[in-house]
Amino acid sequence: MVPEMSERQEFQASDFAYLLENSSYDYGENETYFCCTSPPCPQDFSLNFDRTFLPVLYSLLFVLGLLGNGIVAVVLLSQRAALSSTDTFLLHLAVADALLVLTLPLWAVDAAIQWVFGSGLCKVAGALFNINFYAGALLLACISFDRYLSIVHATQLYRRGPPTRVALTCVAVWGLCLLFALPDFIFLSSHHDNRLNATHCQYNFPQEGHTALRILQLVAGFLLPLLVMAYCYARILAVLLVSRGQRRLRAMRLVVVVVVAFALCWTPYHLVVLVDTLMDLGALARNCGRESSVDIAKSVTSGMGYMHCCLNPLLYAFVGVKFRERMWVLLVRLGCPDQRCHQRQPSASRRESSWSETTEASYSGL
């Protein structure tokens, strides 16, 4: 997976005569994997839409995502000695989201003009994007599993085990994501299209490889994490519903928002990609109107997915009691001039409660 402008074969109406003289053409998404005997559809409208929409969207997500996840990382690192297992996963999640949005300015330039950064940076940027795309989804699954064990089974897997257990889990997640990104190091390259007189960062492999990569993206980057989150949070809700207290009600609202946000952000994109893949495989009829609609839908829905990187700080940190208390403590430590900072600094008893690892407080204190 790379941002949508890099997954589309650019084509102008002026090239139609050229294509009629050639019996084969790389039909599809900016990769050289599909050959057909009929010329592709003009993509002037979808390309113009991308040149306007994607740079603005990517720039906005870059600023918001870097700022929000940067704040989360700074606040968590300010009290490293007191980090719980969930806090550690949140820290890695913030790093993953920040690194993902860090590549968006490069893809914004690619969408607005062309790829001007060479094949080396093309491979690195594509791999970095995908590593952190997979890491974000898998770390969310780790957080849900950790909370499931803590609340449903009252088991502190990481707290009671060796201190390196959570670190090894994170290393395993990053290693798996690096493995998933190997196709980017191998097949991504900067390619110049003489007909368009433009260069773009694109994949270069057969259609079968492209389909396999999409299946990997769908299963490892969406379906499996979503199933883990849905199962774990459904069991958590079953426990919380039979309990009472305002704290647990807040926890119940939070776990519902977590799953809904992930599903709403990424489900539309994967549905559109599924339709596009079925069109590539011939299972769905391809026509110019449908192709243009799918191209635009991929751009819009992928933007919705990337927005999840900006939502994570809000859902997992700013909504959490423990994070807000840590943030005020950090502001006081840095010498916040506003008297309200001192007024909102938590008392010792409140800090002790929110840092506890009991079944009730450990989740609501996220």
Curated annotation (Swiss-Prot):
Indicate where this protein is primarily found. Answer: membrane
Cytoplasmic topology ranges:
77-88, 146-167, 243-254, 321-366
Q: Which Pfam families match?
A: 7tm_1
Disulfide connectivity? 122-201
Record field: transmembrane:
56-76, 89-109, 125-145, 168-188, 222-242, 255-275, 300-320
- Ranges in the topological domain labelled Extracellular: 1-55, 110-124, 189-221, 276-299
Compartment(s): Cell membrane
Q: Quaternary structure per UniProt?
A: Homomer. Forms heteromers with ACKR4. Interacts with PF4/CXCL4.
For this entry, the protein name equals C-X-C chemokine receptor type 3
Q: Which organism is it from?
A: Bos taurus (Bovine)
